[in-house]
Amino acid sequence: MKEQKLIHEGLITESLPNGMFRVRLDNEKMILGYVSGRIRRSFIRILPGDRVKIEVSRYDSTRGRIIYRLRNKDSND
């Protein structure tokens, strides 16, 4: 049976080496996020200040996988 993941939204606060990021979730928890393979393959740039969707395991709530970068309202693209 596949493990159920919790999906949260958050804000990238800091960029760390090797595709890791510090993410502040909407419930004010800080977790460590890493980029999913699909985002890595698509060359999607994630920078501090971006809003993202992050998938968190219910067994380890301190780490999560960034699965989607949300569009900024003030960008032109």
From Swiss-Prot:
UniProt keyword annotation of Endoplasmic reticulum present: no
Swiss-Prot/TrEMBL keywords: Chloroplast, Initiation factor, Plastid, Protein biosynthesis, RNA-binding, rRNA-binding
Parts forming coiled coils: none
Gene3D superfamilies given in the database record: Nucleic acid-binding proteins (2.40.50.140)
UniProt KW tRNA processing keyword: no
PROSITE patterns linked: S1_IF1_TYPE
Localisation per UniProt entry: Plastid, Chloroplast
Residue stretches making up the S1-like domain: 1-71
Molecular functions (GO terms): ribosome binding; rRNA binding; translation initiation factor activity
Major localization listed first in the record, in broad terms: plastid
Pfam families: eIF-1a
InterPro entries per UniProt: NA-bd_OB-fold, RNA-binding_domain_S1_IF1, S1_domain, TIF_IF1
Function: One of the essential components for the initiation of protein synthesis. Stabilizes the binding of IF-2 and IF-3 on the 30S subunit to which N-formylmethionyl-tRNA(fMet) subsequently binds. Helps modulate mRNA selection, yielding the 30S pre-initiation complex (PIC). Upon addition of the 50S ribosomal subunit IF-1, IF-2 and IF-3 are released leaving the mature 70S translation initiation complex.
NCBIfam families: infA
Subunit-structure text: Component of the 30S ribosomal translation pre-initiation complex which assembles on the 30S ribosome in the order IF-2 and IF-3, IF-1 and N-formylmethionyl-tRNA(fMet); mRNA recruitment can occur at any time during PIC assembly.
Full protein name: Translation initiation factor IF-1, chloroplastic
Species classification: Eukaryota, Viridiplantae, Streptophyta, Embryophyta, Tracheophyta
